[in-house]
Amino acid sequence: MSGNTFGQIFKVTTYGESHGPGLGGVIDGCPAGIELSEEIIQLELDRRKPGQGIASTARKEADRVKILSGVFEGRTTGTSIGFHIENTDQRSHDYSKIMNVYRPGHADRTFDAKYGFRDYRGGGRSSGRETVSRVAGGAVAQEFLRQQSISCQAYTVRIGGIDGEVKAPEKAHELPFFSADPDVIPSWEERIKEVRSQGDTLGGVVEVCIKGVPAGLGEPVFDKLDARLAYALMSVGAVKGVEIGAGCKAADALGSENNDFMDGDGFCSNNAGGVLGGISSGQDVVVRAYVKPIPSISKPQQTVDRDGNATEIKIGGRHDICAIPRIVPVLKSMAMLTVADFILLQRRMG
């Protein structure tokens, strides 16, 4: 399997499966002298780890990170940063009864089509658990970007068709669901309880806002900043759509409504989401990701086995009702990895 590395200069390569001994990665290209410790990475991992809140899986993982290389006396050395996270609460026997049956909405059938063999335990490499390594990588990128006065906020704006407002994005990391709207939380909780009682799952929408991005990042045509951000977020398994700025609403707007007018103080609006012609404008870079419902539901579903025989499946095991609260730190991490890479690309080009 290829495709396990993200980035051109600031690179993260990840490894591991949902029910294997552990997961981890190697970060190449991180400059020397960046303050970094296991505690700094752990803070971000704790925001993603399973077993928290009413929407999360019952699987309990401490997700304790161990830095293996590339850090000395609390600072990066400029060499490869290796890290590892153990799996401690996997229950592979939960999948033994469905090992030869394709789960609707999962990558079982496509992995078989490509490789002719697959790890049926929770999806193996295609599991959402793979994203723990991305968050560790994003934590390193965040420390690098902090030196550039660049910060990133990520927050939930919709769950199960119920919209919240962007009222307090700076407090989202303190609130349930990483909500930017405290008032919508009770409605989301009720919706999750309702759907859980039906044996079903929910999706939603996450917004990522990157502040302090200097003008000039991105390359025209095939290496645009917004194109790379969309690629980064779409690489997360549950994401099915990405918008930059006004996004799909721009298709229904007039040019006079969508254009961001300018005056002596700069831009008067930000429908472009901080990117024009694939290059950052100096405004906040705003991206939204549309996340599908978790496909592991306890309702009976029609499917086929590996031999093509029709059958019915009812998925047991431990699964999220809604992945949104745990995917927020993942999307934030992918955005930071992207911007960190572009900062270093810009430096290389002078």
From Swiss-Prot:
Q: Reaction catalysed by this chain?
A: 5-O-(1-carboxyvinyl)-3-phosphoshikimate = chorismate + phosphate
List the GO biological process terms: amino acid biosynthetic process; aromatic amino acid family biosynthetic process; chorismate biosynthetic process
Q: What pathway, per the record?
A: Metabolic intermediate biosynthesis; chorismate biosynthesis; chorismate from D-erythrose 4-phosphate and phosphoenolpyruvate: step 7/7
Q: Molecular function (GO) terms listed?
A: chorismate synthase activity; FMN binding
May I have one GO cellular component term? cytosol
**Cofactor(s) it depends on:** FMNH2
Keywords assigned by UniProt, alphabetized: Amino-acid biosynthesis, Aromatic amino acid biosynthesis, FAD, Flavoprotein, FMN, Lyase, NADP
The reply to whether Endoplasmic reticulum figures as a keyword in the UniProt entry is no
Q: What does this protein do?
A: This reaction introduces a second double bond into the aromatic ring system.
Which family does this protein fall into? Belongs to the chorismate synthase family.
What is the official name of this protein in its record?
Chorismate synthase
